[in-house]
From Swiss-Prot:
Residues 86-130, 188-213 are annotated as: Disordered. Glycans are attached at N80. It comes from Ovis aries. One of its GO terms (molecular function) is interleukin-2 receptor activity. This is Interleukin-2 receptor subunit alpha. The keyword Phosphoprotein does not apply.
Length: 275
């Protein structure tokens, strides 16, 4: 087989999938006196398999995989003790459980979230695995199309001016979270006047905001203080970097096609001379 064809196959199966990955690179918006829930996870969502001190994760991440007819977490998170005297723990099969709050620093809301449904193409919250580092501080890598639902914390009530949810979507060529139209005020406070303009909420989580998708860089595509150095399935998709990666993929594809054409033309001319 020609070297150019080998390079082409390597490009298609290795390089291209990494270039087209669609991941949300920002945290969901942070609202004052409110918290958000994730009722269902889109296919492609990843969760870091983090372990307590003294334990080492076997798998780096757990990924939601499937299609419109069936979806499930394709991996098991479990932790092995770093001490040879201890036996490895038994893995926990991912499954559904009651949804937890993403911000334990905020009190539990008195408003019940929308009822969770088992829909194809989505994964539910997996249960904690044994020796998990902090079940309430899991690091998620959301994908395009993910929606989170907001509700006011206990002691606050909502002034709805629109949908109390945020969705990761493509806006002007960039993946961004839509702004939830929710304002939470104290239960004893007077309602806001209808004509009073509500200040826009930031779509970026400020430092110490309580969202547990903290990263080394701004975004949800990095890991939260890993306890061991493991090659992971990070999706390094940021606005500028994503465009550069796509341009690089196109350039590499063009170069390989050109090399293939030149090789085929050279072989064709050589065969004609021999005839």
């Amino acid at each position: 087989m020609e070297p150019s064809l080998l390079m082409w196959r390597f490009f298609v199966f290795i390089v291209v999938p990494g270039c087209v990955t669609e991941a949300c690179h920002d945290d969901p918006p942070s609202l004052r006196n409110a918290m958000f829930k994730v009722l269902r996870y889109e296919v492609g969502t990843m969760i870091n398999c983090d372990c307590k001190a003294g334990f080492r994760r076997v798998s780096a991440v757990m990924r939601c995989v499937g299609d419109s007819s069936h979806s499930a977490w394709n991996n098991r998170c479990f932790c092995n003790s770093t001490s040879p005297a201890k036996n490895p723990v038994k893995p926990v099969t991912p499954g559904s459980e009651e949804q937890r709050e993403r911000k334990p620093t905020d009190a539990q809301s008195q408003t019940q979230p929308p009822e969770q449904a088992d829909l194809p193409g989505h994964c539910e919250e997996p249960p904690p695995w044994e020796h998990e580092r902090e079940p309430l501080k899991r690091v998620y890598h959301f994908t395009l199309g993910q929606t989170v639902h907001y509700q006011c914390a206990q002691g606050f009530r909502a002034l709805h001016t629109g949908p109390a949810e945020s969705t990761c979507t493509m806006i002007h060529g960039e993946m961004r979270w839509t702004r939830p139209r929710l304002k939470c005020i104290s239960e004893g406070a007077n309602s806001q006047a209808p004509d009073e303009a509500e200040p826009p909420e930031s779509t970026e989580a400020p430092p110490g905001s309580g969202t547990f998708l903290t990263t080394r860089m701004a975004g949800t595509t990095d890991f939260q203080k890993p306890t061991d150095v493991v090659a992971t399935l990070d999706t390094f998709i940021f606005t500028t970097e994503y465009q550069i990666a796509v341009a690089g993929c196109i350039l590499l594809l063009s170069s390989i096609l050109l090399l293939s054409c030149l090789t085929w033309q050279r072989r064709w001319k050589k065969n004609r001379r021999t005839i």
